[in-house]
Amino acid sequence: MSEQLSLEYLFKDRPPAATPADYDMLCVKVGGAELYGELMWPDGNYKKDRPCVILCHGYPGVARNDDLAFALRRIGCVVLTPHHRGAWGSQGTYLISNCVEDAVYLYNYVQSSSFREKYHIDPCAVFLIGHSMGGNSVLQAARKVKGLRGLVLLAPYDPTRFLRDRNEAPLRTLLETGFILHSDGIGAILEDIKRHLEDYAFEDAYPDIKDLNICCFTATLDTIAPPWMVKPLWSRLTAHKTETVQRLVELPSAHGFCNSRITLIRETALFLDAVLSRPMPTADGASL
């Protein structure tokens, strides 16, 4: 087991500490717009440098996965739950590509010396987690950043899949649920996806993430991001020999995993623990 996590508190309250666990507003400026969210950290009894999780919401962001965020905080993680630009009070315009840029920015933000020192972050233990369209956000961000320790995809949604199949209707139906978002309309979001049609195709991410620690959750009753949506990518990952931790977890749930929350939280924590229990690989494949 990792020395940085206390899995026994995954579903149990922590004892009192001189400096209790707490939270604050997340406020950063990305692309000239203020992005808001929540930042939470564990109690002071966690003495070692802490793992950090950036948890990205989907489209339009109703499902926040707060239960997962609180559970990961209890076992020792610093957790950021941002609202993407144009979503839920954050400034700016909502676009799929902006969500990817937000995730990249936040990863670099938590790696800054000021953030690391203030929240006692282990820079070698940063994870990206994303649900639905947030799965695309973190998957594409993982291709762009250096030193990411692991990636968790929760029913990841490939925004290019239906367009590449020349079947725009299901995507348009999903986008119509985003009336709460500040955007230039469905047409603008669609055009943004079309501009990144080849960039964001899930299976094309393979060369960039094939040796990354990854845990992917699919829901067998999911009609929004069915398991087949990630299958081309996962088939390539399965055929590739790697020393990293790569797990596919199939749950008997619909898109929000509403009847499998305990299992989802437990398996996510076990994945983080398995990754952190291993030495951090260096650029040449050796271990620290």
Describe each region flagged by the PLM.
Residues 58-71, 228:
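The serine-hydrolase catalytic nucleophile loop
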Residues 140-189:
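Hydrolase active-site cap/lid region
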Residues 231-234, 238-288:
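C-terminal catalytic histidine-bearing segment of alpha/beta-hydrolase fold enzymes
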